[in-house]
């Protein structure tokens, strides 16, 4: 079962999306702050991160930057911030997608599946190359 870290501080959004993700077969951990997100990320292995931009103690950009220092885990920004500068910043920092709220739930689920599918394909290709002594 694939595991998602959902970083969001709005309780009304957390419950609905977490329920939907779990009903779709994902395990979901939620963090409401940058500090909590980074602690969970260091402690657990995740297949995908969903990040809000605005958090009580910083930004999703802070989480993305810290994660990108040590990991290639897929990251999707899921936020109300639709300013072009935020979108460009998120993608330039290494996010795989940037989705603005309000979003269509089925579209989000399809994007998550597509990103996880690509991530798994790259992981398998990497393992195959390492197994054959090619790197």
What residues fall within each predicted segment?
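CheY-like receiver
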Residues: 119-135
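N-terminal/domain-start alpha-helical segments
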Residues: 1-120
């Amino acid at each position: 079962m694939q595991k998602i870290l959902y970083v969001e501080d709005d309780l009304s959004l957390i419950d609905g999306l977490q329920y939907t993700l779990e009903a779709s077969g994902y395990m979901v951990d939620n963090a409401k702050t940058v500090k909590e997100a980074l602690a969970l990320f260091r402690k657990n292995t995740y297949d995908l991160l969903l990040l809000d931009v605005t958090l009580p103690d910083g930004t999703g950009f802070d989480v993305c930057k810290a994660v990108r220092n040590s990991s290639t885990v897929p990251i999707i920004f899921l936020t109300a911030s639709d300013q072009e500068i935020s979108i460009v910043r998120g993608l330039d920092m290494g996010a795989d997608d940037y989705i603005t709220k309000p979003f269509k739930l089925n579209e989000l689920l399809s994007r998550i599946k597509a990103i996880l599918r690509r991530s798994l394909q790259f992981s398998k290709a990497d393992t195959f190359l390492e197994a054959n002594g090619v790197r």
